[in-house]
Amino acid sequence: MPLGHIMRLDLEKIALEYIVPCLHEVGFCYLDNFLGEVVGDCVLERVKQLHCTGALRDGQLAGPRAGVSKRHLRGDQITWIGGNEEGCEAISFLLSLIDRLVLYCGSRLGKYYVKERSKAMVACYPGNGTGYVRHVDNPNGDGRCITCIYYLNKNWDAKLHGGILRIFPEGKSFIADVEPIFDRLLFFWSDRRNPHEVQPSYATRYAMTVWYFDAEERAEAKKKFRNLTRKTESALTED
């Protein structure tokens, strides 16, 4: 859906008439030309600076392999940005717009009640065939309900550069290939409804991801983590 230069007053209409219906019907959607060239360039330049100054580190695997870095499974380099850091004004503006879109979706997201989100994960696939194998963002109820990815790749040609995000919507007879083109914003459900992969990239590929949390599921996940931590500490003390 091409949007040109978004005005804040348009966000509620976009959320209610496009994002909500698409999420319920197919599980994902994307908006093109989200920020416009000028602001999008500001975000891109800041991300490039983070990359060039060595701020990015190898992405880690979650689940049973939590904390493990295996480059053949996940080849990106990442850092986390809150938006209040010096020089991150454009990123902060981007995050505020995404926040407003999700806020306007509100109760129409079904069972979810969104109160918070993660920091922004800035990611770079450095080329050389790096990608991310098929996975689910939230397979075990950690609270994440919506994944939002903003792409930053100018003149991207998927036939030459690869790097497609391929989504395998649960229960659907199709797959969805999303090219990571500059100024594109993607939304999809974070749970098992949307297994996905990043296909091998043969050029530097930048993206920024935020996850929105369902309040109840997130609280329960934190409670389970605290209980597990206490049990582990107790077992270590007994030993």
Curated annotation (Swiss-Prot):
Q: Which residues bind 2-oxoglutarate?
A: 205
Which keywords has UniProt assigned to this entry? Apoptosis, Cytoplasm, Dioxygenase, DNA damage, Iron, Metal-binding, Nucleus, Oxidoreductase, Ubl conjugation, Vitamin C
Q: Where is the Fe2OG dioxygenase domain?
A: 116-214
UniProt keyword Zinc, yes or no = no
**Renumbered residue ranges of the record's region Required for interaction with ADRB2:** 88-104
- GO BP terms: apoptotic process; cellular response to hypoxia; DNA damage response; protein hydroxylation; regulation of neuron apoptotic process
Q: Where is this region: Beta(2)beta(3) 'finger-like' loop?
A: 62-73
Give an example GO molecular function: 2-oxoglutarate-dependent dioxygenase activity
Q: Where in the cell is it found?
A: Nucleus; Cytoplasm
Summary of activators and inhibitors of this protein: Activated in cardiovascular cells and Hela cells following exposure to hypoxia. Inhibited by polynitrogen compounds probably by chelation to Fe(2+) ions.
Q: Give the note describing cofactor binding and stoichiometry.
A: Binds 1 Fe(2+) ion per subunit.
Enumerate the catalysed reactions.
Answer: L-prolyl-[protein] + 2-oxoglutarate + O2 = trans-4-hydroxy-L-prolyl-[protein] + succinate + CO2; L-prolyl-[hypoxia-inducible factor alpha subunit] + 2-oxoglutarate + O2 = trans-4-hydroxy-L-prolyl-[hypoxia-inducible factor alpha subunit] + succinate + CO2
State the function annotated in the UniProt record.
Prolyl hydroxylase that mediates hydroxylation of proline residues in target proteins, such as PKM, TELO2, ATF4 and HIF1A. Target proteins are preferentially recognized via a LXXLAP motif. Cellular oxygen sensor that catalyzes, under normoxic conditions, the post-translational formation of 4-hydroxyproline in hypoxia-inducible factor (HIF) alpha proteins. Hydroxylates a specific proline found in each of the oxygen-dependent degradation (ODD) domains (N-terminal, NODD, and C-terminal, CODD) of HIF1A. Also hydroxylates HIF2A. Has a preference for the CODD site for both HIF1A and HIF2A.
Q: Please quote what the entry notes about the protein's domains.
A: The Beta(2)beta(3) 'finger-like' loop domain is important for substrate (HIFs' CODD/NODD) selectivity.
Q: What is the name of this protein?
A: Prolyl hydroxylase EGLN3
Name of the gene this protein is made from = EGLN3
